[in-house]
Amino acid sequence: MRNYEALIVFNMKGTETPVEELISTVAAAMKEEGADITATENAGRREFAYESNHLSAGQYVTYTFSAEPSAIRPIRERLRLNPQIHLQYYKVLG
């Protein structure tokens, strides 16, 4: 198992869903694909440097987790289907 960090940017435009609910939904989806989440950090709402897909801001959340390298692709694909996720980046931690 390797340690990873995932930065997820949520699209909060036009949604009534609380941020905490979105955070737990994504965590549950990651766990179903074999990730063991060790930490979650809500960095808050931040403005983008430029507009992206008609959005000027997003809710930034960082997940620290451990998983097998083969689990990253299914996690990424599953979260890609969620319309409330604007961007997602993954980094391998040392």
From Swiss-Prot:
InterPro entries: Ribosomal_bS6 (IPR000529), Ribosomal_bS6_sf (IPR035980), Ribosomal_S6_plastid/chlpt (IPR020814), Transl_elong_EF1B/ribsomal_bS6 (IPR014717). Keywords: Ribonucleoprotein, Ribosomal protein, RNA-binding, rRNA-binding. GO terms for biological process: translation. It comes from the Bacteria. The keyword RNA-binding applies. One of its GO terms (cellular component) is ribonucleoprotein complex. The keyword Isomerase does not apply. Pfam families: Ribosomal_S6 (PF01250). GO terms for molecular function: rRNA binding; structural constituent of ribosome. Belongs to the bacterial ribosomal protein bS6 family. NCBIfam families: S6. Binds together with bS18 to 16S ribosomal RNA. This is Small ribosomal subunit protein bS6. It comes from Akkermansia muciniphila (strain ATCC BAA-835 / DSM 22959 / JCM 33894 / BCRC 81048 / CCUG 64013 / CIP 107961 / Muc). The lineage of its organism: Bacteria, Pseudomonadati, Verrucomicrobiota, Verrucomicrobiia, Verrucomicrobiales. The gene is rpsF.
